[in-house]
Amino acid sequence: MINDVISPEFDENGRAMRRIRSFVRRQGRLTKGQQLALDNYWPVMGVEYQPTPVDFTALFGREAPVVLEIGFGMGTSLVTMAASNPQQNFLGIEVHSPGVGACLASAHEAGLNNLRVMCHDAVEVLENMIPDSSLDMVQLFFPDPWHKARHNKRRIVQAPFVELVKSKLKVGGVFHMATDWQHYAEHMLEVMSGANGYRNLSEQNDYVPRPDSRPLTKFELRGQRLGHGVWDLMFERKE
C-alpha cells in the first residue's frame, strides 16, 4: 500500500526551499463507480482546498474530536474507522482521484456523516487549512518508504514535517504511523525520538502493538501470511 503526500525540502535554518514529492502522481483511469461517486458524493463529503483555516465545527456540523488521515489509499481502513467511531470526525487526504472516488463510494454505502475527504497536497493542507492545536490524532499508514538511499529524502517523515504535525495536534493528541518496511520504521523512530515535545507511547520506547483502532487491511493480512512485519509507532504531543 502506497499513500500519497507531498514533502517539502528545508534548508539548515528550517526554511522551505523546493518541494520534494514523496509520490509519483499516477492518476490511473477512474472506474464508472468511482466517477459516479465523485460526481454525486463529492459535493457532500468533499472539501476543496483553500489557503485559509477550516472551521471543523462548521465543516462537520458538530463539535467532536477530529482525526486526520494522510494518504488513505482506497479508503478501506478510513471508512471502517469512521463507521466504528461515530463519536469522532474524520478528515482524509489523498492525491489520487481513483482512491478518493472509491472512498466516497464506500462512505456513502456505509451511510457515514462523520467523514470528509480532500484531494490535495497534504503538507499544504496542514500548513494552510488545519488550525493549530485542533487535531486529536494524525494517522500516516504505510507511506511510500522510498527504500533506495538516493530517494530517502522523499520520505514524508522528516524533522520539519513532524514539527508541523505537532503544531496541529492538541496537547495530548497522537501521531500514529505504521509501515511494513523495517528500515523506514527505524527511520521514523529516529526522527520522532529526536523531535521535541513528543512522548513515545511504547513502554520500550520503540514500537507499539497494532491498536484495535487501526483495522487490518487485506494488504497487511497478505503480508503477515508471507512473514512480513508491520511496525506501529504512536507519539503523543506533550507540550
From Swiss-Prot:
<feature type="binding site">
    <location>
        <position position="94"/>
    </location>
    <ligand>
        <name>S-adenosyl-L-methionine</name>
    </ligand>
</feature>
<keyword id="KW-0949">S-adenosyl-L-methionine</keyword>
<protein>
    <recommendedName>
        <fullName>tRNA (guanine-N(7)-)-methyltransferase</fullName>
        <ecNumber>2.1.1.33</ecNumber>
    </recommendedName>
</protein>
<comment type="subunit">
    <text>Monomer.</text>
</comment>
<keyword id="KW-0808">Transferase</keyword>
<comment type="similarity">
    <text>Belongs to the class I-like SAM-binding methyltransferase superfamily. TrmB family.</text>
</comment>
<dbReference type="GO" id="GO:0043527">
    <property type="term" value="C:tRNA methyltransferase complex"/>
</dbReference>
<feature type="binding site">
    <location>
        <position position="148"/>
    </location>
    <ligand>
        <name>substrate</name>
    </ligand>
</feature>
<feature type="binding site">
    <location>
        <begin position="217"/>
        <end position="220"/>
    </location>
    <ligand>
        <name>substrate</name>
    </ligand>
</feature>
<feature type="binding site">
    <location>
        <position position="121"/>
    </location>
    <ligand>
        <name>S-adenosyl-L-methionine</name>
    </ligand>
</feature>
<feature type="binding site">
    <location>
        <position position="144"/>
    </location>
    <ligand>
        <name>S-adenosyl-L-methionine</name>
    </ligand>
</feature>
<feature type="region of interest" description="Interaction with RNA">
    <location>
        <begin position="150"/>
        <end position="155"/>
    </location>
</feature>
<feature type="active site">
    <location>
        <position position="144"/>
    </location>
</feature>
<dbReference type="InterPro" id="IPR003358">
    <property type="entry name" value="tRNA_(Gua-N-7)_MeTrfase_Trmb"/>
</dbReference>
<keyword id="KW-0819">tRNA processing</keyword>
<feature type="binding site">
    <location>
        <position position="180"/>
    </location>
    <ligand>
        <name>substrate</name>
    </ligand>
</feature>
<feature type="binding site">
    <location>
        <position position="69"/>
    </location>
    <ligand>
        <name>S-adenosyl-L-methionine</name>
    </ligand>
</feature>
<dbReference type="Pfam" id="PF02390">
    <property type="entry name" value="Methyltransf_4"/>
</dbReference>
<dbReference type="InterPro" id="IPR029063">
    <property type="entry name" value="SAM-dependent_MTases_sf"/>
</dbReference>
<comment type="function">
    <text>Catalyzes the formation of N(7)-methylguanine at position 46 (m7G46) in tRNA.</text>
</comment>
<dbReference type="InterPro" id="IPR055361">
    <property type="entry name" value="tRNA_methyltr_TrmB_bact"/>
</dbReference>
<dbReference type="GO" id="GO:0008176">
    <property type="term" value="F:tRNA (guanine(46)-N7)-methyltransferase activity"/>
</dbReference>
<keyword id="KW-0489">Methyltransferase</keyword>
<comment type="pathway">
    <text>tRNA modification; N(7)-methylguanine-tRNA biosynthesis.</text>
</comment>
